[in-house]
């Protein structure tokens, strides 16, 4: 197979470090055709749905993609903004915040980009752009604090697949999780405290994470454990007792058993147990998206209030808040340790080009195609 290379490489071009942040993805528009395309890519990933491919193809194309895109398009339309989906907007702002911090410290020697595992901007497209910008050392940061094969490993798969098509591979580092990274815990704690200072504190804090099938845990996926560790560390930092917070799991899909307790069932039951007011925060979501804005702040709010609840306060995700950007920058800088920042002064680039030309003339005299 042909491999993608770099045409017309010149030795006076800068070498750079790259930082690529990724998130799950978003459709290109809140329309049925766009959702059908997006869901086809997302739900066909074997990391997401671990069902034998022939059987799953029939279910996906014969049933799901005929029914779900229209319903999902309506949900996305309810949260869509003029600049696109909330997840895309927040992720772009997060990348810009990290980029500005890197620029202040390293100038133009560090390139920061963002990509989506599904949809656009795609991982292959952004990797190609970074290669063309001279990235020779690459750090990948999937914005999933808690590791799961269905998210983090899927991102690794996509990057590895792209690398199989490239002739020149960069040095490569991959951050698989940061569920217990102290600056991340601190950023969440201060964010929640700020919300409480402005809006008051409810009886109980619900920490809702995206769910995964229970069988993933039984097969060794650490996601469940990492979610609970994040919750424990956050609660300790906030000074909460065990009866003052709960860890729940949302967004289940299909009929099989997922991680429990389920967020929706928990919120329906709490008022009957005497808990009349709650704060809800989603530590596993680095940015607000359909699952937080529509599912939690609208759908689950309604479940709680209709069941007898009297107060429901949704605490937004960290998004591109200064505390979150600071935590992500520290995570990036910690993982760049040991990599020398390229020296791209005009003098050093000219010297490198001169030495390369001398070697070329000595080895391939008279050749103009090298």
UniProtKB/Swiss-Prot annotation:
Keyword ATP-binding tagged: no
CDD domains the UniProt entry points to: Ferrochelatase_C, Ferrochelatase_N
One Gene Ontology biological process: heme biosynthetic process
Metabolic or biological pathway: Porphyrin-containing compound metabolism; protoheme biosynthesis; protoheme from protoporphyrin-IX: step 1/1
UniProt GO cellular component terms: cytoplasm
Similarity section: Belongs to the ferrochelatase family.
NCBIfam families in UniProt: hemH (TIGR00109)
Function of the protein: Catalyzes the ferrous insertion into protoporphyrin IX.
Protein name: Ferrochelatase
